[in-house]
């Protein structure tokens, strides 16, 4: 019956790195509506692609480009907290704390557990080691 579906998309030109050439490799093995589920998974995969590209832009110092990628991910995953949270972390990490606070508040509203992660980000060097800033972030939305 109609219980499975798959989608494999590869780069038009091989890079010599097969693990990078698979743009999407998705499958649904058992679902009542496999094409609907495959479409949902494709949206999730696209969103994570944008989040990964955002992370890559951060490492290159292109913060505005990173923010654009995180915003694209947020559009593809409405109501999901993860792209909002990492968008906020990126802004706070470059001193744009005031701009990040509404995003943190929204991420915390959607998933309160993110609030617990924030103090751990300074030791991981994902946020500055600034207790006052960390306290402002943790208090966002309260």
Model-derived regions, located:
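TPR alpha-solenoid repeat register
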Residues: 83, 117-118
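Canonical tetratricopeptide repeat
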Residues: 52, 86, 120-121
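TPR-adjacent "capping" and linker segments in tetratricopeptide-repeat scaffold/adaptor proteins
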Residues: 7-10, 26-50
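Short coil turns that delineate tetratricopeptide repeat
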Residues: 44, 78, 112-113
């Amino acid at each position: 019956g109609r219980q499975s579906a798959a989608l494999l998309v590869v780069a038009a030109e091989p890079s010599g790195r097969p693990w990078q050439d698979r743009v999407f490799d998705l499958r649904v093995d058992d679902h009542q509506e496999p094409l609907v589920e495959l479409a949902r998974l494709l949206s999730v995969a696209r969103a994570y692609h944008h989040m990964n590209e955002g992370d890559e832009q951060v490492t290159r110092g292109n913060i505005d480009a990173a923010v654009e990628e995180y915003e694209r991910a947020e559009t593809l995953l409405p109501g999901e907290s993860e792209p909002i949270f990492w968008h906020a972390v990126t802004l706070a990490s470059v001193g744009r704390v005031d701009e990040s606070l509404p995003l943190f508040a929204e991420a915390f509203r959607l998933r309160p557990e993110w609030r617990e992660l924030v103090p751990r980000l300074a030791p991981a060097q994902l946020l500055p080691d600034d207790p006052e800033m960390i306290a402002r972030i943790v208090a966002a939305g309260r």
